Amino acid sequence: MASLSFVSSSHLTLRTPSIALRSTGSSPRTSVSFSVKAQSVALSQDDLKKLAAEKAVEAIKPGMVLGLGTGSTAAFAVDQIGKLLSSGELYDIVGIPTSKRTEEQARSLGIPLVGLDTHPRIDLAIDGADEVDPNLDLVKGRGGALLREKMVEAVADKFIVVADDTKLVTGLGGSGLAMPVEVVQFCWNFNLIRLQDLFKEFGCESKLRVDGDGKPYVTDNSNYIIDLYFKTPLKDGFAAAKEIGKFQGVVEHGLFLGMATSVIIAGKNGVEVMTK
């Protein structure tokens, strides 16, 4: 495989990647590692996120319908798409945003936007993740856009996830950070209690998400979010998703299972592309 070089203010150099197969449960995962060397300055987390996001954007071809993710890492990808459109290097694409925030960003960059009603099939979606396990299953939605993210990414032919290495976990829920569940406002506390009880064996604590003013956080869909915090990882993400879905008033959850086709992880030692 040919060497790839990136020249930027960080003076990054990508050297020839090595390829290895790793066993991850029932199916092997292909891992392609790109060595990254900082020649003059230390790489920040944002530098690495940007590098990984730009790597994901390389998969975009003219004529594609794109799913545009939400969050700090996805924003770098949207920025890069806008730059390529402006320079003429990319053309004849349309995007479907996963949040009002992403919609505003895309419009400001001149990215043509459409919706699922007119474009129900998506060629490629690019988004970030909050947790990534060895099987490329995900926790997403800490940015509050989980419902629209899942609607868009579930119908994508390819779904590339971009994240930094702090998002890697051995089991979903293992980071100790929030796993979001979007619920209707009506009797939200009823579902908060039920969700905490459902996962009591994992030491779950459920909290209503609030904004900077201490008021309930309201999603783009006018719903609330209940954040679940686990002391131990979930044993079976698919079983957990099924049980959450049984609760009336639950709109969506942040378990994105069997959806990612590849994950690009940026870390202090380089960028790794993992595929199923």
From Swiss-Prot:
GO terms for cellular component: chloroplast; chloroplast envelope; chloroplast stroma; chloroplast thylakoid membrane; cytosol; thylakoid. The modification Phosphoserine is found at S108. Pathway: Carbohydrate degradation; pentose phosphate pathway; D-ribose 5-phosphate from D-ribulose 5-phosphate (non-oxidative stage): step 1/1. Its EC number is 5.3.1.6. GO terms for biological process: pentose-phosphate shunt, non-oxidative branch; reductive pentose-phosphate cycle. It comes from the Eukaryota. Belongs to the ribose 5-phosphate isomerase family. This is Probable ribose-5-phosphate isomerase 3, chloroplastic.
